[in-house]
């Protein structure tokens, strides 16, 4: 992620060989995955069960990994509606600078055992520890999604999005570029 801030010097630690889904219980909405696993592989496995990563990790390359997505903390266009990547981290297994294999959090939605250290590593770019496994909360895919496109300038787009945000609309993402506002609606067919 050199494009994001100052490029770092040093050796790259490649974890792409440390891949695979460790545990996935669709009924519990939890997936534990090794961090070298590609985002595409995780999304495919979830889609087969009608589920998704709600934070929609951006894909900067076809072989982007879950470890990269969580380590960078990047979230996609659904962030405003669903939450950020760190909001979906239930637990992590990491290697610290001393080489210790540590686990924080767990595989349950409610974790009230003090500080949520598993979320600290989300967005830390590997500066706190090397993430080796992550347990993620996943969500059911919406029944239907559609994107509306409006021609409007910056000020009108900001005003429209702010107005719509205060209404009970199933908006899951917005994007404005080159005089066009894209509004994605997600949910039940009747609502969309």
Feature roles, as predicted:
Residues 1-7, 18, 36:
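Active-site beta-strand/loop segments that form the cofactor-binding cradle
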Residues 3-7, 23-24, 43-44, 192:
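Short loop/helix-cap segments at secondary-structure boundaries that form the rim of catalytic
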Residues 3-8, 75, 106-107, 133:
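Short acidic, glycine/serine/threonine-rich loops at helix termini
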Residues 67:
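ATP-binding N-lobe of GHMP and related small-molecule kinases
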């Amino acid at each position: 992620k050199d494009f994001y801030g100052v490029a770092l010097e040093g050796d790259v630690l490649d974890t792409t060989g440390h891949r695979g889904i460790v545990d996935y219980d669709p009924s519990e909405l939890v997936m534990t995955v090794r961090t070298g696993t590609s985002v595409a592989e995780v999304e495919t496995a979830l889609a087969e069960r009608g589920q998704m990563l709600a934070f929609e990790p951006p894909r900067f390359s076809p072989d982007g990994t879950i470890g990269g997505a969580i380590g960078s903390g990047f979230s996609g266009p659904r962030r405003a509606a669903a939450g950020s990547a760190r909001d979906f981290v239930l637990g992590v297994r990491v290697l610290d600078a001393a080489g210790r294999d540590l686990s924080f959090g767990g595989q349950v939605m409610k974790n009230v055992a003090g500080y949520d250290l598993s979320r600290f590593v989300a967005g830390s770019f590997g500066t706190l520890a090397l993430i080796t496994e992550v347990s993620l909360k996943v969500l059911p895919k919406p029944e239907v999604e559609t994107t509306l496109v409006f021609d409007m300038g910056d000020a009108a787009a900001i005003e429209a999005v702010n107005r719509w945000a205060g209404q009970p609309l199933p908006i899951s993402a917005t994007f404005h570029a080159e005089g066009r506002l894209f509004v994605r609606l997600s949910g039940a067919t009747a609502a969309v």
